[in-house]
Amino acid sequence: MLAIRLVHLIEKHSDALSRGLAVEIRKSDRTSDFRKIPPDELKLAATEVYRKLGEWLLQKTESDIAGRFKVIAQQRAAEGISLHQFVWALMLTRDHLWKFLRREAFADTAVELHGELELHQLLNQFFDRAVYYAIVGYEQAEQPGPPTNELLRARDLAISIGLMEERGATRDIIEE
């Protein structure tokens, strides 16, 4: 129960948390690549996590987390954000939450302490998965995809008019 109250506290303060996190990410030397991203876009990305934290922790499946963080990672990779800096930004996002909770919510009883520990476990589990799937997303962004139908049609046309030999065409497409 207390964990849910703490999540609601985070969601209620999501705008202020997001602003603070965006500033922290832009100032950190470990996340200097993020200076390429407009501040409002950084704040919006943080707000997405903070404002819907309850959903992410309690309702979203691992598949939901995988899908979202792979896409975000691929987008950041395309924007030139290095993987280690993206992972550090995720760690800053988690740590920023903990600083906020230490300021705003202190456990006075064993039950409250249990609630804080429960939230700590849920947050760590969420961010561990976010980091894992972000790395998967970066790896997928680096791998060339399979030949498209257009490439295959072009290859077939080149073979049919004698510009390519069938055997070499397959190897050329695979190597590219």
Residue ranges and their predicted role:
Residues 1-84:
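N-terminal low-complexity or simple alpha-helical regulatory segments
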Residues 2, 6, 62-175:
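Long, amphipathic alpha-helical coupling/dimerization segments that relay conformational signals between
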